């Protein structure tokens, strides 16, 4: 859109492509860490259109990739629904061979095996293709306070939605109100995903007390209802009235996270995004690093844990190197003194919590953790026992420095 304006949904002409490449190179010279593109059908603008660039031609992508030539830094990030298409993989490979730059792509278990094959092929040529792996499936947290509430499709609940939380909980304890909910026609969202995460009770899981994020199939709202001889809607209302979060997994969750951890253990993988702010009332994955250290490396009993040292390396030096941040991730002379001091036996997440501290009393999910004795940045203590010290030694990151 920056280059093409209102024509951004049209095919780019030669002048547009040349300008995009020029802007990319200018940004890289100014210190940009790289270039990112979305070719994913889930990314829409506010009008419901696919974001510009979703269908950008290979010619356009190759020209932008060419902007990296000779600079010696910069990473290319690609989110694509086409990673099983040979044409897509061909231009990705060509950019890597032309520029020598690292490319990282989003992937998921059971899909896109071709990207892993290409990653191995590239490594044999001394090139780096790094598929990104999430520690957990893409998910949302639903609750009475959350942006997404599965009861909001019922007219009777809509009528009380603006009441204080304690009054809504009282309504959910009222047999007459519950019966009214169960007998009325829900108003479904036209978006298939939105309808799915308000009606698919076999894909809704109350967040367990251990915060494992790894429930068994029997632990779903539907599974609990069957075990208790109740209707799923009754279990849903009970769970929400108890102020428990309900997690909904996208991507076909199969009852454990082993496929995700198996991907993380692959040689060419890199940890993917753990979103802590973009979807304030919907999820809080800023807890993922603590989750990996505590649950995946220590507390997991469903299947094997991953070695603690491996997880620390994957989250620090291994990830930093993908973006050319080669001054961190190791405790050694010449590196930034960035590290946490942890009481590992006490390292534990707290449940997600909704707070109202954004402008206009806006809400956001937070998730605190215990066990961090100190966080040190550039040799200065920035947090001590979870409390900010006021020290702000961080600096603006620039690529190529």
Language model regions located:
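C-terminal cap of metal-dependent C-N hydrolases
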Residues: 262-269, 274-275, 286-288, 341-387, ...
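Acidic, glycine-enriched loop/beta-strand segments at the rims
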Residues: 247-260, 307-310, 320-354
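Short, well-structured alpha-helical segments that form the helix of a local strand-helix-strand
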Residues: 233-240, 307-316, 331
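Active-site neighborhoods of metal-dependent hydrolases
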Residues: 1-14, 20-66, 78-300, 304-305
């Amino acid at each position: 859109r920056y280059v093409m304006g209102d024509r951004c949904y049209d095919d780019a002409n030669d002048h547009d492509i040349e300008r995009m490449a020029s802007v990319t190179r200018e940004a890289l010279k100014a210190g940009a860490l790289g270039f990112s593109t979305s070719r994913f059908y889930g990314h829409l603008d506010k009008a419901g259109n696919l974001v510009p660039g979703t269908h950008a031609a290979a010619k356009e992508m190759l020209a932008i990739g060419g902007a990296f030539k000779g600079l010696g830094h910069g990473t290319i990030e690609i989110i694509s629904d086409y990673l099983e298409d040979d044409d897509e993989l061909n231009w990705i490979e060509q950019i890597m061979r032309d520029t020598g730059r690292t490319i990282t792509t989003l992937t998921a278990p059971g899909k896109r095996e071709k990207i892993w094959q290409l990653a191995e092929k590239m490594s044999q040529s001394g090139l780096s293709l790094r598929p990104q792996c999430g520690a957990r499936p893409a998910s949302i947290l639903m609750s009475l306070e959350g942006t997404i509430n599965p009861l909001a499709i019922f007219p009777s609940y809509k009528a009380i939605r603006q009441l204080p939380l304690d009054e809504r909980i009282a309504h959910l304890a009222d047999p007459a109100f519950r019966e009214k909910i169960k007998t009325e026609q829900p108003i479904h969202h036209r978006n298939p995903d939105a309808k799915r995460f308000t009606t698919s009770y076999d894909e809704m899981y109350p967040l367990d007390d251990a915060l494992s994020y790894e429930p068994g199939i029997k632990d779903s709202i539907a599974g609990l209802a069957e075990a208790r001889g109740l209707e799923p809607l009754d279990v849903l209302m009970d769970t929400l009235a108890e102020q428990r979060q309900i997690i909904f997994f996208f991507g076909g969750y199969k009852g454990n996270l082993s496929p995700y951890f198996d991907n993380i253990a692959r040689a060419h993988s890199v940890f993917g995004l753990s979103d802590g702010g973009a979807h304030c009332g919907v999820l809080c994955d800023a807890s993922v690093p603590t989750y990996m250290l505590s649950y995946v490396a220590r507390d997991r009993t469903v299947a094997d844990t991953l070695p603690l040292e491996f997880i620390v390396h994957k989250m620090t030096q291994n990830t930093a190197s993908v973006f050319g941040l080669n001054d961190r991730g190791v405790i050694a002379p010449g590196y930034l003194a960035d590290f946490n001091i942890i009481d590992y036996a006490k390292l534990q997440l707290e449940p997600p919590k909704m707070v109202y501290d954004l402008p206009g009393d806006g809400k956001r999910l937070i998730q605190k953790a215990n066990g961090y004795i100190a966080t040190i940045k550039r040799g200065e203590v920035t947090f001590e026992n979870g409390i900010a010290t006021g020290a702000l030694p961080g600096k603006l990151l620039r690529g190529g420095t």
